């Protein structure tokens, strides 16, 4: 830990307060974040927790040392949506093979997309299908302890039975009673449930569906419920390698430091995770600190396919910055668009709702262009240590105050403090050394062009277009092309308004 490191403080959803972070073991800081269900392209709402907790991962590594931090983010590869996609996309294949194709291709795309957003790989990415043994063992323990029961080849968890015992109470995270949660929840009504709030730990597989040997003496094949998957995977990757798990009676060894995810997961998913893990492992807490990022809207509206504003990460990388055009290496183009998307998201505090707009994305790309231009001009090299990132680190140590961190970067740019700018960008995952050192990056061919003059001529052309004076509009376009500046017209996908971008050609 750096001697001058500020005190890290994080908002804990469990206590509803900002707390000084005190790891269970400073030489083994552990964090779990709920990851993707791999059945379709990830959307920009999925990108937000990936970026938020990547920044926290980087900060923890900066404060405690990279070798002392373990970050687990799961991959859910058992789900009804996966089954439906497999049946739709590969009707002629055996079902298990179709499922494998869906999960492998979708996961590969997810990994490529989030890498383009500037994220580090987590330490481990457990897949649900690799941890069936742990799930069955946890379920057996819960049945033995009287908080789960078998009914019609299902195993269900009973929140009422949990609350009848000594120890943590169901609803502590959401801060609602069972009656309040029942009133506000969409719960499956099934005859085999003892109580409406009981939730599935294991269920029988339907004919043709993937299935595994069942726990609790059930003879038919089955598959896990969603919530038990995360309890089992976090135990397998953050507890068992370090002496915890079902064979350990030490409550401290059966807790980890931080659990993260989107605000939509507080109930029922995270509430159910806590119930399962605490009852199975005999702890008061599953994780000491629970962190949740806020919702995302698109151009002021809820993102949905019905509104036509559903945007995937791949959409942003391919089309979010149309001025990029086609590069010789579109992987590099994706990385630039990904950094712009990352900066755009980090301009809103992680706990606040975010409004995704095409304008902010474009503005973020322009700001990155200025920052990288300074780094290129001054010959900045990839830093081995972040000894000049103290202002950014101090901001992030205040509950990941990314806006204050970006303000520090802007100040460093203003005074041309290249070390503080570059190292601060690195700490936030905004520094890609390629864009500092490469000589053939198309966007930096703009450096010798008068951007303000071009913007004025584009505005003049737009006035002619609005007046339907096509001849004058075409004249400006052609004159700019003769000067080596090519215009490209497109529409804002959310508003339908004309967007004109430009690039240097020839």
Curated annotation (Swiss-Prot):
Residue positions of motif 'HIGH' region: 36-46
Protein keywords: Aminoacyl-tRNA synthetase, ATP-binding, Cytoplasm, Ligase, Metal-binding, Nucleotide-binding, Protein biosynthesis, Zinc
Transmembrane segments annotated in the record for this chain: none
UniProt superkingdom: Bacteria
Keyword ATP-binding: yes
GO molecular-function terms, A-Z: ATP binding; cysteine-tRNA ligase activity; zinc ion binding
UniProt cross-references to InterPro entries, sorted A to Z: Cys-tRNA-ligase (IPR015803), Cys-tRNA/MSH_ligase (IPR024909), Rossmann-like_a/b/a_fold (IPR014729), tRNA-synt_1_cat_dom (IPR032678), tRNAsynth_Ia_anticodon-bd (IPR009080)
Matching Pfam families: tRNA-synt_1e (PF01406)
Residues involved in ATP binding: 305
Keyword Ligase annotated: yes
Enzyme class: ligase
UniProt subcellular location: Cytoplasm
EC number: 6.1.1.16
PANTHER family: CYSTEINE--TRNA LIGASE, CYTOPLASMIC, CYSTEINYL-TRNA SYNTHETASE
Assembly and interaction partners: Monomer.
Name listed for the protein in its UniProt record: Cysteine--tRNA ligase
Organism: Brucella suis (strain ATCC 23445 / NCTC 10510)
Lineage: Bacteria, Pseudomonadati, Pseudomonadota, Alphaproteobacteria, Hyphomicrobiales
């Amino acid at each position: 830990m750096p001697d001058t490191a500020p005190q890290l403080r994080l908002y804990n959803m469990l206590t509803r307060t900002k707390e000084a972070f005190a790891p269970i073991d400073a030489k083994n800081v552990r964090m779990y974040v709920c990851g993707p269900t791999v059945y379709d392209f990830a959307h920009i709402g999925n990108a937000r927790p990936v970026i938020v907790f990547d920044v926290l991962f980087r900060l923890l590594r900066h404060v405690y040392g990279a070798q002392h931090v373990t970050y687990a983010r799961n991959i859910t590869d058992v789900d009804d949506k996966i089954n439906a996609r497999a049946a739709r996309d590969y009707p002629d294949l055996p079902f298990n093979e179709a499922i494998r194709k869906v999960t492998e291709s979708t996961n590969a795309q997810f990994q490529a997309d989030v890498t383009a957003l500037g994220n580090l790989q987590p330490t481990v990415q457990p897949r649900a299908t690799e941890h069936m043994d742990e799930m069955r063992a946890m379920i057996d323990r819960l049945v033995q302890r009287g908080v789960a029961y078998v009914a019609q080849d299902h195993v269900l968890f009973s929140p009422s039975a949990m609350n009848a015992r000594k120890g943590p109470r169901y609803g502590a995270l959401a801060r609602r009673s069972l009656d309040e949660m029942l009133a506000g929840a969409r719960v499956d009504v099934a005859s085999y449930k003892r109580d409406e709030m009981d939730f599935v730990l294991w269920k029988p597989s339907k004919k043709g569906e993937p299935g595994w040997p069942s726990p609790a003496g059930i003879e038919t094949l089955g598959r896990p419920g969603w919530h038990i998957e995360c309890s089992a995977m976090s135990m397998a990757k953050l507890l068992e390698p370090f002496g915890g798990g079902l064979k350990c009676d030490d409550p401290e060894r059966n807790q980890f430091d931080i659990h993260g995810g989107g605000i939509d997961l507080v109930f029922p998913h995270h509430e159910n995770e806590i119930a399962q893990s605490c009852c199975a492992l005999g702890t008061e807490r599953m994780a000491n600190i629970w962190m949740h990022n806020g919702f995302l809207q698109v151009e002021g509206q809820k993102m949905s396919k019905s509104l036509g504003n559903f945007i995937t990460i791949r959409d942003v990388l391919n089309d979010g910055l149309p001025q990029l055009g086609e590069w010789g290496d579109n992987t590099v183009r994706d990385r630039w668009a990904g950094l712009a998307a990352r900066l755009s998201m980090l301009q809103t505090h992680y706990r606040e709702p975010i409004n995704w707009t095409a304008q902010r994305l474009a503005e973020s790309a322009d700001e990155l262009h200025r920052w990288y231009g300074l780094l290129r001009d001054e010959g900045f090299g990839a830093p081995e240590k972040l000894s000049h990132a103290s202002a950014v680190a101090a901001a992030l140590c205040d509950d990941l105050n990314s806006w204050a961190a970006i303000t520090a970067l802007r100040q460093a740019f203003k005074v041309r403090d290249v070390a503080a700018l570059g190292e601060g960008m690195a700490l936030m995952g905004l520094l890609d050394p390629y864009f500092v050192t490469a000589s053939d990056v198309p966007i930096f061919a703009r450096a010798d062009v008068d951007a303000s003059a071009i913007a004025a001529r584009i505005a003049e052309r737009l006035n002619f277009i609005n007046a339907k004076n096509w001849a004058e509009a075409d004249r400006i376009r052609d004159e700019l092309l003769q000067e080596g500046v090519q215009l490209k017209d497109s529409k804002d996908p959310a508003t339908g308004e004309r967007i004109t971008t430009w690039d240097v050609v020839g």
